[in-house]
Amino acid sequence: MADCSALESLIEMGFSPSRAEKALSATGNQGIEPAMDWLVEHEDDPDIKEPSVVIPEDSGTDTTDTTDTQAMDTSAERLPLTEEEKEKQTKRMMELIAQKQKEREEREKRERIEQEKQRRKHGQELSAIKQRMQEQEMQKAAEDRRREKQEERLARERVREKIARDKADRARKFGGAGSEPISPPAETSVPATAPSPSSPVQEPPTKKEYDQCRIQVRLLDGSALSQTFRAREQLAAVRLYVELNWPGGPPEPFSLLTSFPRRVFTEEDMEKPLQELGLVPTAVLIVAKK
């Protein structure tokens, strides 16, 4: 089978397809140059696919006319090319080959340039699409961050409002206990007894009354809060004080206890005065997780 590129080149030079195929076939498909040499050498050969001239028979033609016709055909035949003519023909064909090669290279160059333009254009379009997607993602991320910050701010406000409400409720509930007037301790009346002449008079010891007490509360992190309370204030007032003054607020529900003697105060104890719980005049309370 003839080489397609060589066949097309020969056809572009002006050779008929049949002669080009015959030249390539005769030279064993070794390329365009051997085929061109063959075409130059066989330029006078009739084309294998060109119809031969058929002279119609005419019974009225005599021998003399036939002889004249053959002589004319013989004289019309072209003489073989000389070496100089062959060189010129080869040179012309080589120039045609060079021209066709140059045209083909220029065409391929234009095609490569166009392909490069299309590639760059496609790359620019992809870059633009990628940039738009990145900008959209960044914008969405910024909107998400703004929304999260807004939600966090609202959540903090709700927590602060709840803490404020709880503090106010506890202050209303337990704050009145400390406003009770402190009545002086009742004097215990000792019945007068006649002194015995045989024994000295002994007065019973009087129990000292305290109207205030100093409470120290140790928090979970080891820090401490100290405050003075009225002896008749309820233990709930101490718990409220701890909740209000705990740095950052208490992390979780807690209970109060004493280490010696060990005692964990219950919710019922919160309603009892400090004096009744034995926390007067001073006491150390420890915060423990519930």
From Swiss-Prot:
Residues 80-117, 132-172 have a biased composition (Basic and acidic residues). Residues 81-171 form a coiled coil. Residues 49-210 are annotated as: Disordered. Residues 1-42 form the UBA domain. Transmembrane segments: none annotated. Its main location: cytoplasm. It holds the Pfam family UBX. One of its GO terms (cellular component) is cytoplasm. GO terms for biological process: negative regulation of proteasomal ubiquitin-dependent protein catabolic process; negative regulation of protein K48-linked deubiquitination; negative regulation of protein ubiquitination. Gene3D superfamilies: DNA helicase RuvA subunit, C-terminal domain, Phosphatidylinositol 3-kinase Catalytic Subunit, Chain A, domain 1. SUPFAM superfamilies: UBA-like (SSF46934), Ubiquitin-like (SSF54236). GO terms for molecular function: K48-linked polyubiquitin modification-dependent protein binding. Residues 185-201 have a biased composition (Low complexity). It is found in: Cytoplasm. InterPro entries: UBA, UBA-like_sf, UBA_UBXN1, Ubiquitin-like_domsf, UBX_dom. Residues 208-287 form the UBX domain. It comes from the Eukaryota. Keywords: Coiled coil, Cytoplasm. SMART domains: UBA (SM00165), UBX (SM00166). Component of a complex required to couple deglycosylation and proteasome-mediated degradation of misfolded proteins in the endoplasmic reticulum that are retrotranslocated in the cytosol. Involved in ubiquitin-proteasome systems. This is UBX domain-containing protein 1-B. It comes from Xenopus laevis.
